[in-house]
């Protein structure tokens, strides 16, 4: 159901990318995401135990490099996938932007779709810095990392509808988020409002994820969207749980602290 005919300019590495091999590899290996998740969980609990009796590591320069690398990657990903999605919206409409599988195998976006799902494994490295620097590790952080890895690998192999929206939104939010982390790690003073904006962007992303899932479900009934009920169920459960957790985090981190500050004054 690839009805996308793009006139967007491709870079040479995007042209040379073999999406068929990538999709086949993911179909054969997507379950390895469970192994990565198990190793990640083991590292979290083992690492925190080992660090209990050790002094924290500074790791400022490695953290700047790490965050900056992910920021640049996310910025390019957001620009390229965003260009694709805007083109489809302008020329084909909303339904096509949600249901078109061309995001996985079409020009421009095919490379970035695969890069996105693969990046969810190395992004687990965010937690290494938190543990080694003995910072607070909240449930939302590691739950989000594990579930995004599992779901993105699980969905990419089937080229399910909605993926273009999910990936483009995530690229966009991460472009801002990792840029913020890089600035903070480099010692720049960044307004608290910037952090609030990022969390609000994440909440908006989760709301949009729920809306996209609803549209996929409705259009799937008329054989206009390629997906299956099991995928929509897990995706909806994931996005709803994120929505609740990010709203709770926003209230605790910003609204609650504002109220405490007001009372103290």
UniProtKB/Swiss-Prot annotation:
List the Pfam families hit by this protein, alphabetically. Answer: ELO (PF01151)
Q: Name the enzyme group at the top EC level.
A: transferase
Domain of life according to the entry: Eukaryota
Tissue pattern of expression reads: Ubiquitous.
In which pathway is this protein known to take part?
Answer: Lipid metabolism; fatty acid biosynthesis
Name where it's found. Endoplasmic reticulum membrane
Q: Which GO cellular component terms are attached? A: endoplasmic reticulum; endoplasmic reticulum membrane; fatty acid elongase complex
Q: Report the PTM annotation.
A: N-Glycosylated.
Residues carrying a glycan: 2
According to the record, the segments passing through the membrane are: 34-51, 70-90, 111-131, 136-156, 159-179, 197-217, 232-252
Q: Which reaction does it catalyse?
A: a very-long-chain acyl-CoA + malonyl-CoA + H(+) = a very-long-chain 3-oxoacyl-CoA + CO2 + CoA; hexadecanoyl-CoA + malonyl-CoA + H(+) = 3-oxooctadecanoyl-CoA + CO2 + CoA; (9Z)-hexadecenoyl-CoA + malonyl-CoA + H(+) = 3-oxo-(11Z)-octadecenoyl-CoA + CO2 + CoA; dodecanoyl-CoA + malonyl-CoA + H(+) = 3-oxotetradecanoyl-CoA + CO2 + CoA
Keyword Lipid biosynthesis among record annotations: yes
Q: Which PANTHER family match?
A: ELONGATION OF VERY LONG CHAIN FATTY ACIDS PROTEIN 6, FATTY ACID ACYL TRANSFERASE-RELATED
Q: Which family does it belong to?
A: Belongs to the ELO family. ELOVL6 subfamily.
Q: What does this protein do?
A: Catalyzes the first and rate-limiting reaction of the four reactions that constitute the long-chain fatty acids elongation cycle. This endoplasmic reticulum-bound enzymatic process allows the addition of 2 carbons to the chain of long- and very long-chain fatty acids (VLCFAs) per cycle. Condensing enzyme that elongates fatty acids with 12, 14 and 16 carbons with higher activity toward C16:0 acyl-CoAs. Catalyzes the synthesis of unsaturated C16 long chain fatty acids and, to a lesser extent, C18:0 and those with low desaturation degree.
The name on file for this protein is Very long chain fatty acid elongase 6
**Which organism does this record belong to?**
Homo sapiens
